Design a protein with these regions (language model features):
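Transmembrane alpha-helical segments of integral membrane proteins
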Residues: 195-203
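Helix-loop segments that flank and shape redox-cofactor active sites
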Residues: 33-41, 59-83, 164-176, 207
Length: 248
């Protein structure tokens, strides 16, 4: 099989993962529609970054377990990705940025104190996403975790490149070089590379029909959960609803 995923006719596993991502792509969510219209408050976009930062903290801790279980090429990607996230390595030789610092630039501009960000809690569906990553890491082969991640990181390209950055420039007074929106501009391009590498790894290591089917199933479940987490984010921010409250 020369290390490629086994399938007879039909789409490749790469093509199927891309189709799953596009079907559930959160750049099509009403949250980003309101942003593109200039109707979303900046503090609500900042709250997305707060939730994202808390989630990523758990994702990267759990992926350390995946690193320990992975073949060398997957392990190398994980180390490089972690180094870029922490600002120890620039993307494609560019300037290195700690992504937490990029987030703080925008949250400070939007009225959040650093303590507010650090002391925030994950919304219930975002907490469920974190727990789901830990479960996949514990229960599934490393390549299933990589397939899941392939459908998640690459969504940031569309969300930021097609929706967030143009909206922030058109409606909110920023320029493409405004340091406050550095998180959005960097992720409009950085995750193209990451997504391609992840898809290549899945093509190489999802070598049986059973492994391929499992990777696709859990990738779609993760995409659905991401969409649902944006539903909750949208409801508690733009719609101002109280969700997840204990009954009286």
């Amino acid at each position: 099989m020369d290390g490629q995923s086994e399938h007879v006719g039909g789409p490749s596993v790469r093509e199927e993962l891309i189709a799953i991502r596009e079907r559930w792509h959160c750049m099509n969510h009403p949250f980003y529609d309101r942003l593109s219209e200039g109707e979303l408050e900046l503090r609500h976009l900042a709250y997305f970054l707060v939730q994202h930062s808390l989630l990523v903290r758990q994702i990267f801790r759990s992926i350390g377990v995946t690193y320990a279980k992975s073949p060398d090429d997957i392990a190398h990607f994980i180390v490089e990705n972690l180094a870029e996230e922490a600002g120890l390595l620039g993307i494609d030789g560019g300037e290195a940025h700690d992504h937490r610092d990029l987030i703080f630039r925008f949250t400070r501009h939007s009225g959040w104190t650093d303590d507010d960000v650090r002391n925030a809690e994950l919304l219930p569906t975002w907490y469920a996403r974190a727990a789901y990553y830990w479960w996949i890491t514990d229960a599934e082969p490393p390549i299933v975790r990589i397939a899941v991640q392939a459908t998640q990181e690459s969504q940031l390209v569309g969300e930021n490149g097609a929706r967030a950055v143009p909206a922030l420039i058109e409606h909110y007074g920023f320029s493409e070089n405004s340091p406050e929106i550095g998180f959005f501009t960097e992720h409009a391009t950085a995750d193209v590379k990451h997504g391609d590498i992840l898809l290549d790894l899945v093509e190489k290591h999802a070598t049986t029909p059973e492994l391929r089917a499992r990777a696709l199933r859990l990738a779609e479940q993760t995409c659905k959960l991401r969409w649902v987490s944006f539903n909750e984010l949208y409801r508690v921010t733009h719609l101002g609803e109280e969700v997840g409250q204990a009954p009286e």
